[in-house]
């Protein structure tokens, strides 16, 4: 996207002259929406991000959260929507590679990946093409680099047919003493390591800062190299303690990396582009500055520690060059064959002006009068929905056991559980959630719902939530309704984080998610990280023969934005479920008090109580007889009781359990009753086939 007239004038005034071609490329890339957050950062500053256990929050490539004395976890989320729309295989693969490198910047070893994927209807040929190639790209990269994909969330909606939302989260672990030590000083070297620069991904950040109109240039999409990605992991593991700082070379290329490094350390940089190792010797300096060639890191290292880093790079056969160093002063200098092609003050380089767009609120469509449908047919429709169905066809393509750290695997529970071998039975619990329908109807309440859903998933498995990262994906901010959606979503996240006392330590905003003038439904994904003291006590979403079944929490008549409303009545209307933060916090305490004494548990969410019970039966391979009318509720309609998506609820199973007993697990038939009336009956195997994507 071209610089605006006002931005060009600001650059001319800041430089005191006309910018060079290389400087124009520098600013076009680094001042793009994708890199500068110029339309969003004013609002993002409002998000709460601090807590005693947060070692490093927002503002650098990756945060750090202390989960045990001297043991840190880093996790971060990234979007790769535009590239995945044009080249879904490489778009998804490079999204995974990029988020892994972000985690490497704090010296952490990547231990897990999660993905939040939003596609068009699976029966649509184009959506199916994107879906298949995105999943293959994630699978191929994750499997080859040796980082397991342990969970995520998948959503299908017409809005994402041509504009998918592809989000990747990486979790890494690092001992406190292994974090790069900082203390950057003049004379320290900038070592660029990884693939040689070429023209791949040229202008990728500018490409991600405009809407899709069809016929986009594939050259803006980067190409992944998981073998080199794995080598960089090995180098960081071996030489991370030798260096002072690590920076990912991602969006914006060298332009953004140099601007951020200079700004973070308040030092000048002298960088010789002609000393950079390249694969395309015909590339012009302005192209090398903004190239987004993948699998590259910048290591900041002192002259005396350079041999330690070089030894590791040579051992793993990673190409590298030493084209830059920190210098006194406040300018970024880039040299090319003896000529200074970039000479920019730090304050200007990292000083993209903020933009505030007009906002236009709207009200969601009112919930219409709904006829009560035949319940057996309604149950089949909801349970077979792609948004409720089990996603075995996706996660079975991932090697989720590589590294043997996955204690609760995809499909087994509400969240992934990872064992931390550094600390006995201590583990991490992590889950990401989003509901674009909710955030379309009410962006503020929808964002809060995404937060509490991920929080509750972590809690029900047995984790104590510690921190969160978020990803907000909307259309063009130049549309007043879209900009209002974004601002409202931030307010919802701020409220949820503050009320739940879970800091937001990082995030990503992706704008211009449109195709041919049509914005996607605003999509707010929240990934919550928690800790569990004993992974062997984690709750899976299943029961055993003879278990009693319990429901905790009250079902209210909240079907606005529900899967039932869309699937059975073809309507998207009403308000999303209300959020009771006290009830959500209570779930943490209740589950902790029962930890190790339950067979299993699952939260109640999309598809309502009916979907939660059916999931438990299918996961277990054991049927049940359940009287849903025993569940605590204030509704008078059976369809609302079955399909309401009220928050603050979960299902548990065991000899005893929290909440109200509603049935018993036994046999191979799943029966739903209301008192003496049979509402639904399916053999578990039949139910399993019905619920497969």
UniProtKB/Swiss-Prot annotation:
A single GO molecular function term of this UniProt record: magnesium ion binding
GO annotation terms (biological process): 'de novo' IMP biosynthetic process
Gene Ontology CC, one term: cytoplasm
Residues annotated for ATP binding in this entry: 37, 76, 470, 507
Pfam family membership, one: AIRS_C
Catalysed reaction equations from the record: N(2)-formyl-N(1)-(5-phospho-beta-D-ribosyl)glycinamide + L-glutamine + ATP + H2O = 2-formamido-N(1)-(5-O-phospho-beta-D-ribosyl)acetamidine + L-glutamate + ADP + phosphate + H(+)
Organism: Pyrobaculum neutrophilum (strain DSM 2338 / JCM 9278 / NBRC 100436 / V24Sta) (Thermoproteus neutrophilus)
Entry similarity comment: Belongs to the FGAMS family.
Location in the cell: Cytoplasm
Residues that hold Mg(2+) 2 according to the record: 102, 248
Stored HAMAP family: PurL_2
Residues that coordinate or bind Mg(2+) 1: 78
InterPro entries attached to this UniProt entry: PRibForGlyAmidine_synth_PurL, PurL_linker, PurM-like_C_dom, PurM-like_C_sf, PurM-like_N, PurM-like_N_sf
Subunit structure as annotated in this protein's UniProt entry: Monomer. Part of the FGAM synthase complex composed of 1 PurL, 1 PurQ and 2 PurS subunits.
Enzyme Commission number(s) from the entry: 6.3.5.3
Amino-acid positions noted as binding substrate in the UniProt annotation, renumbered to this chain: 79-82, 101, 222, 292-294, 510
Metal-binding in keyword set: yes
PANTHER family given in the database record: PHOSPHORIBOSYLFORMYLGLYCINAMIDINE SYNTHASE SUBUNIT PURL (PTHR43555:SF1)
Name of the protein in question: Phosphoribosylformylglycinamidine synthase subunit PurL
Pathway, per record: Purine metabolism; IMP biosynthesis via de novo pathway; 5-amino-1-(5-phospho-D-ribosyl)imidazole from N(2)-formyl-N(1)-(5-phospho-D-ribosyl)glycinamide: step 1/2
Function text: Part of the phosphoribosylformylglycinamidine synthase complex involved in the purines biosynthetic pathway. Catalyzes the ATP-dependent conversion of formylglycinamide ribonucleotide (FGAR) and glutamine to yield formylglycinamidine ribonucleotide (FGAM) and glutamate. The FGAM synthase complex is composed of three subunits. PurQ produces an ammonia molecule by converting glutamine to glutamate. PurL transfers the ammonia molecule to FGAR to form FGAM in an ATP-dependent manner.
């Amino acid at each position: 996207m071209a610089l605006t007239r006002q931005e060009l004038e600001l650059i001319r005034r800041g430089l005191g002259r006309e910018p060079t071609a290389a400087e124009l490329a520098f600013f076009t890339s680094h001042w793009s929406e994708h890199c500068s957050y110029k339309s969003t950062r004013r609002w993002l500053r409002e998000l709460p991000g601090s807590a005693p256990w947060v070692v490093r929050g927002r503002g650098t490539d990756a945060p750090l959260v202390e989960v045990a004395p001297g043991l840190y976890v880093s996790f971060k989320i990234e979007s790769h929507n535009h590239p995945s729309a044009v080249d879904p295989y490489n778009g998804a693969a490079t999204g995974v590679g990029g988020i892994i490198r972000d985690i490497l910047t704090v010296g952490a070893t990547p231990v897990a990946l999660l993905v939040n994927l939003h596609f068009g209807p699976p029966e649509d040929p184009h959506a199916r093409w994107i879906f298949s190639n995105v999943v293959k790209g994630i699978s191929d990269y994750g499997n080859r680099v040796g980082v397991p994909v342990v969970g995520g969330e998948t959503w299908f909606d017409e809005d994402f047919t041509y504009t998918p939302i592809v989000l990747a989260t990486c979790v890494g672990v690092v001992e406190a003493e292994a974090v790069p030590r900082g203390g950057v000083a003049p004379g320290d070297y900038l070592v660029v390591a990884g693939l040689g620069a070429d023209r791949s991904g040229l202008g990728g950040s500018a490409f991600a800062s405009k809407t899709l109109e069809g016929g986009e240039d594939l050259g803006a999409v980067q190409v992944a190299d998981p073998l080199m990605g794995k080598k960089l992991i090995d180098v960081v593991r071996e030489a991370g303690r030798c260096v002072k700082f690590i920076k990912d070379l991602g969006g914006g290329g060298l332009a953004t990396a140099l601007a951020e490094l200079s700004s973070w350390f308040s030092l000048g940089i002298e960088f010789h582009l002609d000393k950079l190792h390249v694969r395309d010797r015909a590339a012009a300096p302005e192209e090398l500055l903004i190239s987004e060639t993948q699998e590259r890191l910048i290591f900041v290292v002192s002259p005396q520690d350079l041999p330690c880093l070089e030894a590791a790079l040579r051992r793993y056969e990673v190409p590298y060059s030493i084209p830059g160093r920190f210098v006194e002063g406040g300018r970024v200098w880039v040299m090319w064959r003896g000529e200074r092609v970039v000479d920019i003050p730090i304050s200007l380089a990292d000083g993209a002006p903020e933009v505030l767009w007009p906002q236009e609120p709207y009200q969601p469509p009112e919930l219409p009068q709904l006829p009560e449908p035949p319940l057996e047919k309604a149950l089949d429709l909801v349970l077979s929905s792609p948004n409720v169905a089990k996603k075995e066809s996706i996660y079975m393509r991932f090697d989720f056991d590589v590294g043997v750290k996955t204690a609760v695997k995809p499909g087994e529970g509400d969240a992934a559980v990872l064992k931390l071998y550094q600390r006995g039975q201590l583990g991490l619990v992590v889950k990401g959630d989003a509901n674009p329908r909710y955030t379309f109807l009410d962006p503020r309440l929808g964002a809060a719902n995404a937060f509490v859903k991920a929080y509750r998933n972590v809690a029900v498995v047995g984790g104590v939530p510690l921190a969160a990262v978020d990803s907000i994906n909307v259309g063009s901010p130049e549309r007043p309704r879209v900009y209002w959606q974004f601002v409202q979503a931030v307010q919802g996240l701020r409220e949820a984080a503050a009320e739940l006392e879970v800091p937001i330590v990082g995030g990503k905003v992706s704008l211009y998610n449109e195709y041919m003038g049509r914005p996607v439904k605003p999509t707010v994904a929240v990934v919550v990280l928690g800790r569990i003291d004993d992974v062997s006590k984690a709750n899976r979403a299943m029961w055993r023969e003879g278990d009693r079944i319990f429901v905790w929490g009250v079902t209210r008549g909240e079907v606005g934005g529900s899967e039932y409303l869309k699937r059975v009545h073809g309507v998207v209307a009403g308000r999303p479920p209300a959020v009771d933060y006290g009830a959500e916090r209570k779930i943490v305490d209740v589950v902790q008090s029962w930890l190790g004494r339950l067979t299993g548990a699952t939260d109640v969410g999309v598809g309502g109580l009916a979907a939660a019970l059916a999931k438990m039966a299918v996961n277990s391979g054991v049927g049940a007889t359940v009287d849903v009318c025993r569940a605590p509720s204030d509704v008078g309609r059976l369809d609302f009781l079955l399909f309401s998506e009220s928050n603050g609820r979960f299902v548990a199973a065991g000899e005893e359990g929290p909440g109200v007993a509603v049935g018993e697990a036994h046999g191979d038939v799943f029966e739903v009753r209301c008192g003496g009336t049979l509402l639904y009956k399916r053999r578990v195997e039949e139910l399993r086939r019905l619920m497969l994507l």
